Amino acid sequence: MPLPLLPPLLLPLEALLDLALHLVDSTGVAYSARQVTPTAPLPRLRGSSTSNDVTDNSGCKELTFIFARGTTEIGNMGTVVGPKVGEALKSLTGNKAAIQGVDYPADAAGNAALGGSGGPKMASLVETALKQCPDTKIVLGGYSQGAMVVHNAASKLSSGQVVGAVTFGDPFKSQKPDNIDQFKTFCASGDPVCLNGANVMAHLSYGNDAQTAAQFLVSAAGL
């Protein structure tokens, strides 16, 4: 199934942050549906921005989570939501989850590739994980550009290789990925990427959905 055209408002993460700064007036109040202020503390980040349980062949776990970060995020997991989902999965499964980030450029130019710069790498990681641990349950996740990576990777996989997937701020939120039965997407109200909204901070809020996403993936895996 061909992927839809890229929404015109899909901006790189650093551009979203720059725009967010310009939305703050002299009183220090950000124009956001959630009334985010620059003096309010950001949510505490949990987990690491890099995780390589598959590529390091760290041992078989009941669940394997492969995640693609958003544009310009650091490491291979990013910081907005990937590490938080990973930590939640470990907690919910009693540390029986392997976590792997997709090492792809995640640069602004990659948005035009509609996930093509990371999709093949994510699909390859799925194959590697199943070769190392045939009984593990594979689940996928992606944020922003990384969400497109999930769609691209799914089209290269066979039915049954991946039991579930979640995406956040997904430009293709209306399209269920190929070959994945259990799929859930998170799109915050006002998100300029998945809803063509005007609330830039909404696109950075998906850490709030990490626990719900992890619970969905654990259920999809039958654990």
From Swiss-Prot:
The active site is at S144 (nucleophile), D191, H203 (proton donor/acceptor). Induction: Induced by oxidative stress, in a manner dependent on transcription factor napA. It is found in: Secreted. GO terms for cellular component: extracellular region. Keywords: Disulfide bond, Hydrolase, Secreted, Serine esterase, Signal. One of its GO terms (molecular function) is lipase activity. Residues 1-26 form the signal peptide. It catalyses: cutin + H2O = cutin monomers. GO terms for biological process: lipid catabolic process. It is an enzyme of class 3 (hydrolase). Disulfide bonds join C60-C133, C187-C194. The record marks T71, Q145 as: Transition state stabilizer. The keyword DNA-binding does not apply. InterPro entries: AB_hydrolase_fold (IPR029058), Cutinase/axe (IPR000675), CUTINASE_1 (IPR043580), Cutinase_monf (IPR011150). Its EC number is 3.1.1.74. The 2 disulfide bonds play a critical role in holding the catalytic residues in juxta-position; reduction of the disulfide bridges results in the complete inactivation of the enzyme. Its main location: secreted. Catalyzes the hydrolysis of complex carboxylic polyesters found in the cell wall of plants. Degrades cutin, a macromolecule that forms the structure of the plant cuticle. Also degrades suberin, a specialized macromolecule found in the cell wall of various plant tissues. PANTHER family: CUTINASE, CUTINASE 2-RELATED. Belongs to the cutinase family. This is Cutinase 4. It comes from Emericella nidulans (strain FGSC A4 / ATCC 38163 / CBS 112.46 / NRRL 194 / M139) (Aspergillus nidulans).
